[in-house]
Amino acid sequence: MPAPAAPSARLNRRLLLSAASSSLALAASGLMGLPLRAQEAPADAPPASVPVAAPQQFSYDWLTEEMRVAATQPHVEPENLTGFLGELQYDDYRSINFRTDRSRWADTDSMFRIQAFHLGWLFGAPVRLYDVTDGYVHEVRFSTDDFEYRNELSTRVAAHVDLPGVAGFRLNFPLNRPDVFDELVAFLGASYFRALGRGNGYGISARGLAVNTATSAPEEFPRFSRFYLERPHGGGLSAVLYAAMESPSVTGAYRFVITPGIETMIEVTARLFFRSAVTQLGVAPLTSMFLFSEKNRATYDDFRPNVHDSDGLAVRRRDGDILWRPLNNPPRLASSYFGEENPQAFGLHQRKRSFDDYQDAEAHYELRPSVDVEPIGDWGKGMVRLVEIPTRYETNDNIVAFWVPEGQISAGDAREFAYRLRWGALPIEEPSDIAHIWETRAGHGGVSGVENTGETRKFVIDFKGGLLGGLPGDAEVEAITSVQHGQIVTQTLERLDGMDIWRLVLDVAAAEGATVELAAHIAGYGRKLSETWLYQWMKA
C-alpha cells in the first residue's frame, strides 16, 4: 500500500466551506496553508479538564429532549467574537497551531487524542466540547496556553486567556503506525466533518445535514454547537461522540460511533426537530470536487490527466443493481435525481487508484477516500440528488450528493435517520460477476480524421471484469441504451483484444442548449452483465 499523503496544508483546503454563504459559491481559494498534520504522541500530560459547576449525568435521550425543546424556541445566532479573536485574518490563522503536548486524553489509557481548532477568522461561532466519563459530563476548556502563536501573533496574544470555545476539533488515532497518532476525523465549520481510512489523504467531506441546497429557498448551514465525547477505556477501538445541531429551521441530536481501520466506519444517528417548514431536506450529504478527467480535459492546459477527489456517484439499489454516474464539471448548474426506495447504499467514489492516473506528487489524488452512505432501518421512498457546480479551480468543492426523503417537512415535525459512512479505498469489484464501468471518455463525434459535420458527441464507455470480461468477442451480448432529449445516432459494442474489457461507443445528437440524459448497460444470456452507466450531457 502506498504511504499516506502527508496531512499537509494541501489536505485541508475545504474544511472551511461552511464560511461560504451558499454551497453554490464554494470558493475556498488560498486555504491550503492550514496546519492539519499527523501528530507524534505528546510528551507531557495535558491540563485537567475543568468541570462544569455541577457535573450532570448525560445520555443521548437527554440531549434529544434538550434539542426537542430548543426547537420550540426562537433560534439565536451566536454573538460576534471580540478582542483579538475578532481581529484574526487569514495569515494570522495560518500562524496558529494546537500544541501537541496539550492533547486531551493523553493522560488516559484511551487510544484516541483530542486536539482543537482555534476560533477566529472564518470560524466565529464558538463550539463547546464536553468529556463524558462514567456517564457524567465535564466541560473541556481551552485557553491561549493550548496554542502556539507564531510570527507577530506571539506579541499580540496574551498567555493564560480563557477562550469562549473552539472552532472544532480533530480526533487522532494510530491509524497507519502504532507509534504515530494520525488524524482520523475532523469536525470544523458548520456541520462539516471528514475522516480517513488507512493509507488515505483528506478529500471528500460529509455534513450533518443539508437544508434547501440548490433550491429557490435560502440555504441554511446547520452547525454543531456542542460535542459530548465519551472517553474510551481499556484500549477501546471505537470512539462515541454526540453533537447538538442548531439552525434557524431545525435542531438535532446526533450520535457518532467512529471505528478506525482500513475502512473507517462512522455510524450516525440523527434525531431532527423542525422549527419551520423546509423546502428540501438533504440527509447524509457528501461534498467533493471534480475539475476534469479524460472526458472533459480538453479545456484545461494541465500536465495532469485527472484532477478530482471523486470521479463518480455510485448507487446500490434495493434489488442490488448498481448505478454508476460519472461526475461532471458542467457549463452551468446541474442536478440529477435518482428515485429510490430503501437503497442499499449511495456514495461518491474515487475509482482511479494509480499515481499514473493523476501525476500529482503533491495532492496525491489517488489516495483520496471514497465514501458510501449505507442506510440503517427503513428510509422509505425518496431520491438521491446529485448537484454539480461549474468551477475553474480545484480548490472549490463543486459536487454535492444527498438523500431527499419523500414528503413535506412542516413546522413541528420530527424525523430520525440512521446510517453508516464507510471511508476508504472502497472495492469496485463487488459483486464479482458484474462488470463495472472502468472508464468514460468523450469527444467530437463522427469518424476520426474526418470533419464532424453532424455535430454529434461521442461517448466511449469501457466495461471491465465480471462474467462479461471472460466472454469471447462473438458472445451473444448486447448494449441496452436509452436517451432523453437527444438521439443516439450510432452505437457499437466490441471486446478489446487481450483485455477483459468491452467497449461501448455512442454517437449522440441533440439540439443546442439541450440537457441530455443517457443510460446504458450490457446484457446477455438472460441476465444483466454490467453496472448501469448514467450520464448527463449539456450541449452548451
Swiss-Prot record:
Its main location: periplasm. Pathway: Glycan metabolism; osmoregulated periplasmic glucan (OPG) biosynthesis. Involved in the biosynthesis of osmoregulated periplasmic glucans (OPGs). SUPFAM superfamilies: E set domains, Galactose mutarotase-like. This is Glucans biosynthesis protein G. The keyword Signal applies. The gene is opgG. One of its GO terms (cellular component) is outer membrane-bounded periplasmic space. Residues 1-38 form the signal peptide. Belongs to the OpgD/OpgG family. It comes from Cereibacter sphaeroides (strain ATCC 17023 / DSM 158 / JCM 6121 / CCUG 31486 / LMG 2827 / NBRC 12203 / NCIMB 8253 / ATH 2.4.1.).
